[in-house]
Structure formats: structure tokens, C-alpha cells
Amino acid sequence: MTIAFQLAVFALIATSSILLISVPVVFASSDGWSSNKNVVFSGTSLWIGLVFLVAILNSLIS
């Protein structure tokens, strides 16, 4: 169970880092938002899901 928690935390950190870089780039590009809107929403949905997964796994471990 600890391995699953550590992998979920790593995935959350990796997703956060990717979104931290990609979202400003999408907003700064001229046609970026209209063409990459689905990718940003998918990444945000993944991030929210990982936050809940980490919270659930944390409650099971401690």
C-alpha cells in the first residue's frame, strides 16, 4: 500500500510540474487556447483525480 501511495504522490508531483509549465505556454500562444483547450481540461481533471487518490490512500495508510 505504501508503494501505491508513493507512486500516486509522484504522479501528482509530475502532473503538477507539467501543468505548471504547459498552462502558461498555452495561454501565451496566439491560437493556443482554442486548439489545446481539451488537453488543459484533461490535465486538470487528472490532477484533481490524483489529489483525491492521494487523500484516500493517505487515510488508509495512517
From Swiss-Prot:
**Which keywords accompany this UniProt record?**
Chloroplast, Membrane, Photosynthesis, Photosystem II, Plastid, Reaction center, Thylakoid, Transmembrane, Transmembrane helix
Q: Quaternary structure per UniProt?
A: PSII is composed of 1 copy each of membrane proteins PsbA, PsbB, PsbC, PsbD, PsbE, PsbF, PsbH, PsbI, PsbJ, PsbK, PsbL, PsbM, PsbT, PsbY, PsbZ, Psb30/Ycf12, at least 3 peripheral proteins of the oxygen-evolving complex and a large number of cofactors. It forms dimeric complexes.
The function of this protein is: May control the interaction of photosystem II (PSII) cores with the light-harvesting antenna, regulates electron flow through the 2 photosystem reaction centers. PSII is a light-driven water plastoquinone oxidoreductase, using light energy to abstract electrons from H(2)O, generating a proton gradient subsequently used for ATP formation.
Q: Which GO terms describe its cellular component?
A: chloroplast thylakoid membrane; photosystem II reaction center
Query: What stretches pass through the bilayer?
Result: 8-28, 41-61
Read off the HAMAP family from this record.
PSII_PsbZ (MF_00644)
Q: What family is this?
A: Belongs to the PsbZ family.
Cross-referenced Gene3D superfamilies = Photosystem II PsbZ, reaction centre
Protein's GO biological process: photosynthesis; photosystem II stabilization
Write down the membrane topology. Multi-pass membrane protein
Which cellular compartments is it found in? Plastid, Chloroplast thylakoid membrane
UniProt cross-references to NCBIfam families, sorted A to Z: PS_II_psbZ (TIGR03043)
Name this protein carries in UniProt: Photosystem II reaction center protein Z
Q: What is its main location?
A: plastid
Query: Matching InterPro entries, A to Z?
Result: PSII_PsbZ, PSII_PsbZ_sf
